[in-house]
Amino acid sequence: MKVLVLNSGSSSLKYQFIDTDTEVALCKGVVDRIGLPGAFIRHQKNGQEIVKEQEINDHNVAIKLVLEMLTHEEAGIIHSMDEIDAIGHRVVHGGEYFSDAVIVNEEVKKAIRECIELAPLHNPANLMGIEACEKEIPGKPNVAVFDTAFHQTMPRYAYMYSLPYEVYEKYKIRKYGFHGTSHKYVAIKAAEYLRRPLEELKLITCHLGNGSSVCAIKYGKSVDTSMGFTPLAGLAMGTRSGTIDPAVILYLMEKEKMDVKQMNDFLNKKSGVLGISGVSSDFRDLEKAANEGNERAQLAIDMFCYRVKKYIGEYAAVLGGVDAIIFTAGIGENNALVRDKCLTDLEYMGVLYDRERNFNVEKGKVFEINKPESKVKVLIVPTNEELMIARETKRLLSK
């Protein structure tokens, strides 16, 4: 089966065309600056890259451009739209409606629309991507794969907030969790690597990137995760605050005369390691600054790693032990210093971490960074959300 995988953002559209039989991306690319000046498409096939600048007013035009590239004489990979078997879409928020991927119909679109207020930045764009495909590739099934779906197995006592129960009934305010597609993918890969059934394993997965979350996975099911009602909760992130005392928000709004929108921006775009360091949200810049003696950059790194470590301890308690700790995503896969700080002094948990292996990782594959005698495995697993979306699409349509 050949699946076009789409990740629609508010002003960008990332795509991969995946053959699910070989699990290879035949080509991939991004349409960027949709609706803005300087819009372009960057298309890659066999290591060759084409960049084309033109006016791209909306997601319909973006999808048309992607299809043009897929059928392009030299850069293309197919002769006609008939060779696209299905389209798999990343949808950020499925609320309580979806605990699995679904084939899109009017009812599904209505539910995605109803979750817009839970994910105002992402869901409208995800929906635009779906509707653009329905228009430009009629007759082909669209499948929605939700970031939140994997976490719908969390027990009630883990996902509820200790607010008056009526607030949950009225507004569905609860923990949802995100990065579910990534957490699920790396858990499956880890089980394959360990040659043990996923249903027997207790795993802690750390998806560390510009947005970061940790997940406790017991016997293949998510039982807790660090993000909450929105992706703002949990770890300190690139520009997001992570969990703070809610009273701080009220105090600051009063002191600084901030309205809700300003506070939202403050917490989502100006906080995290950027806010602490005053340097950058990028860990490469932070490390460089810290090495040059910038104390705030060092503090930002220390705070980030401290929180990851706290969640590892917390989730080991929740799971009643742990078989493997997994690091993935941009920082998790590539930043040895961060992993080092997160894994030091965990011997009491049975984690015997191999520092030398951590700083000499073989990229692009599952890599073990624990000592042979360690009770707990520590793995670096490259994530592949697009492949997971393609797999989910195939699974649903093969039923």
From Swiss-Prot:
Residues annotated as binding substrate: 90
Record keyword Cytoplasm present: yes
Residues involved in Mg(2+) binding: 7, 385
Pathway annotation: Metabolic intermediate biosynthesis; acetyl-CoA biosynthesis; acetyl-CoA from acetate: step 1/2
Residues annotated for ATP binding in this entry: 14, 207-211, 282-284, 330-334
Location of the active site: 147
Cofactor: Mg(2+); Mn(2+)
Reactions that this protein is recorded to catalyse: acetate + ATP = acetyl phosphate + ADP
InterPro entries: Ac/propionate_kinase, Aliphatic_acid_kin_short-chain, Aliphatic_acid_kinase_CS, ATPase_NBD
NCBIfam families the record matches: ackA
Subunit structure: Homodimer.
Protein name: Acetate kinase
